[in-house]
């Protein structure tokens, strides 16, 4: 949903380094998603929000605005899928970058096939999920 770009830009102009489109806050939605995908993305986002210091409720949505400063300073290691979005979120949270979210509506594609490869991407997602949790629980600072 590209209609939210203006709102994302406003958040960026207010000092945010990451502005995340969120399906799981008031005004956001996720429609037509396969059951297993829905359970996985909701569970990961819910637990990261409540068990870590990551300040957004939709950690797995890759539709985000990133500041140039962030992209110049944070090394992206992820090689598969949308793992980069979780990686950047976890690393930037450790570095105390300002992270905000705005509501977004998301609908499963009606044409073509999904590029979501859960079993292929899961190891990378788990790596950055644990990295995000360790920021809070193990007080790790190393990037």
Name the predicted role of every residue range.
Residues 67, 92, 102:
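Residue-level signature of catalytic and energy-coupling elements of molecular machines
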Residues 93-94, 121-122, 137-138:
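Juxtamembrane/interface motifs at transmembrane-helix termini
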Residues 128-143:
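C-terminal, non-catalytic tails of nucleotide-sugar-dependent glycosyltransferases
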Residues 46, 50, 95, 136:
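Phosphate/oxyanion-binding loops and surfaces in catalytic or ligand/nucleic-acid-binding neighborhoods
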Residues 56-58, 96-106:
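Catalytic beta-strand/loop signature of glycosyltransferases that borders the donor
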Residues 2-82, 108-119, 123-127:
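Acceptor/aglycone-binding surface of glycosyltransferases and processive sugar-polymer synthases
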Residues 84-91:
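Short active-site alpha-helical segment characteristic of glycosyltransferases
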């Amino acid at each position: 949903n590209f209609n939210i770009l203006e709102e994302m830009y406003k958040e960026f102009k207010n000092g945010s380094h990451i502005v995340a489109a969120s399906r799981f806050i008031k005004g956001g939605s996720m429609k037509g998603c396969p059951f297993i995908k829905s359970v996985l993305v909701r569970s990961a986002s819910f637990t990261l929000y409540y068990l870590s210091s990551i300040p957004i409720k939709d950690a797995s949505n890759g539709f985000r605005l990133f500041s140039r400063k962030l992209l110049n300073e944070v090394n992206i290691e992820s090689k598969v899928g949308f793992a980069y979005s979780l990686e950047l979120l976890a690393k930037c949270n450790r570095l105390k970058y300002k992270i905000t979210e705005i509501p977004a509506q998301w609908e499963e594609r009606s044409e073509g096939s999904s590029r979501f490869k859960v079993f292929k991407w899961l190891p990378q997602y788990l790596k950055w999920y644990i990295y995000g949790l360790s920021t809070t629980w193990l007080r790790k600072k190393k990037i």
